[in-house]
Amino acid sequence: MSVLLFGVSHRSAPVSVLEQLSTDESDQAKIVDQVLQSSLVTEAMVLSTCNRVEVYAVVDAFHGGLSVIGQVLAEHCGMSLNDLTKYAYVRYAEAAVEHLFAVASGLDSAVIGEQQVLGQVRRAYTSAEANHTVGRTLHELSQRALSVGKRVHSETGIDAAGASVVSVALDIAEAKLGSLAGRTAVVIGAGSMGALSAKHLVRAGIERVHVVNRSLPRARRLAQSLLDQGVTADAHTLDDIAHALADADVVITSTGAVRPVVSLADAHRGLTGRPEHRRLVICDLGMPRDVEPAIAGLPGVNVIDMERIQREPSARAAASDADAARSIVAAEVANYLAGQRMAEVTPTVTALRQRAADVVEAELLRLDNRLPELDAAHRAEVAKTVRRVVDKLLHAPTVRVKQLASAPGGDSYAEALRELFELDQQAVDAVAAGELPLLPIELDKSE
């Protein structure tokens, strides 16, 4: 069984398609449940961010698994499978591992090097684990991806080179408005992105922030954190968006809502009576979009969406930092795959040791029957000698086969071992399933 990835992202599809594919936690659980109804799929999880929807699955067959995942996603977004595949990409086995490591490292983000995706990978895994839809393969893959992402961010300068989506959006806003110091902002959404937006606004010297959120208590908590930092702030529900827009210079919105939260009517009401020369920049970081497209056509209004952010030079990390990150990812992929190949041969090695132990026990029993006059001391010495000989004979080939199996293409060595020693595949599978004990080779160091 191998890992199969079916995905659509900002690199393969326009925002309109990503909007159709956007998912919340409930949608993700349904997608995984539907995928797992197929006997071809044994594990699955969904990674959904503002820029991508990816399904990672452990499948018994490539084409069959691909068909299952594609059909489920097509039904979810209301597209035909043929139309969806125009925007999709597929990665399998080693390529799927490399892709997830790159994603967790921020190398595949709209803003190269941003760190938010690492938390999104963690949440995708945590959610799948809570729903019992990941097993050993996706567990190990996800944990290693998180580790790789942390290593890339700690050992390279990609964090500084690749700014967050919010900081890039605010850079564009400042290019249009001038300094944000002393200005008024609206933050729509009081979750993690809202908190990040507020943090960047404080750094930019913003004077006043209207926090708008579906839940007023959450809006109040974020507003209070701004007040604690010396920034004037108040809290509003979504019904007050028009009021909040009235004196705003910049808006940052990222709610994860399934439909726009800022309507054209809201914008008309909020902008009525504003001086004609006063400009408003709206940073729409939502996916689907939080802002009705028609708002971009209003006089004095600039809407910055994710497609615009992707075109910004500051959204791309410095070449040297990105290259360093890619080198780390490549090395980690090689190490991970070597470990996986070695793990695959281990049950075969263990089954061989188990068979050798069974042969030894059978021969010792035969010896007991033939030489019943042997006393306990001599019988123990003979048993020790026989086991030592078997251990020494097996040690070099079993160590070597693990080394050979860890190299690319090394999966054939496990099969060769099974053929040479006529090992029963069921016995090997039993070891892999944990039904047989793992028997270590114990060499007598005194000899």
From Swiss-Prot:
Listed A to Z, the keywords are: NADP, Oxidoreductase, Porphyrin biosynthesis
Q: Known CDD domains for this protein?
A: NAD_bind_Glutamyl_tRNA_reduct
Q: Where is the signal peptide?
A: none
**Record-annotated residues binding NADP(+)?**
G189, A190, G191, S192, M193, G194
The record's section on InterPro entries has: 4pyrrol_synth_GluRdtase, 4pyrrol_synth_GluRdtase_dimer, 4pyrrol_synth_GluRdtase_N, GluRdtase_CS, GluRdtase_dimer_dom_sf, GluRdtase_N_sf, NAD(P)-bd_dom_sf, Shikm_DH/Glu-tRNA_Rdtase
What does the record give as the reaction this protein catalyses? (S)-4-amino-5-oxopentanoate + tRNA(Glu) + NADP(+) = L-glutamyl-tRNA(Glu) + NADPH + H(+)
Site annotation (Important for activity) points to H99
Query: Do the record's keywords include Cell wall biogenesis/degradation?
Result: no
Q: What's in the domain note?
A: Possesses an unusual extended V-shaped dimeric structure with each monomer consisting of three distinct domains arranged along a curved 'spinal' alpha-helix. The N-terminal catalytic domain specifically recognizes the glutamate moiety of the substrate. The second domain is the NADPH-binding domain, and the third C-terminal domain is responsible for dimerization.
What this protein is called in its record is Glutamyl-tRNA reductase
Organism, as annotated: Mycobacterium sp. (strain KMS)
Q: What is the lineage of its organism?
A: Bacteria, Bacillati, Actinomycetota, Actinomycetes, Mycobacteriales
Gene name for this UniProt entry: hemA
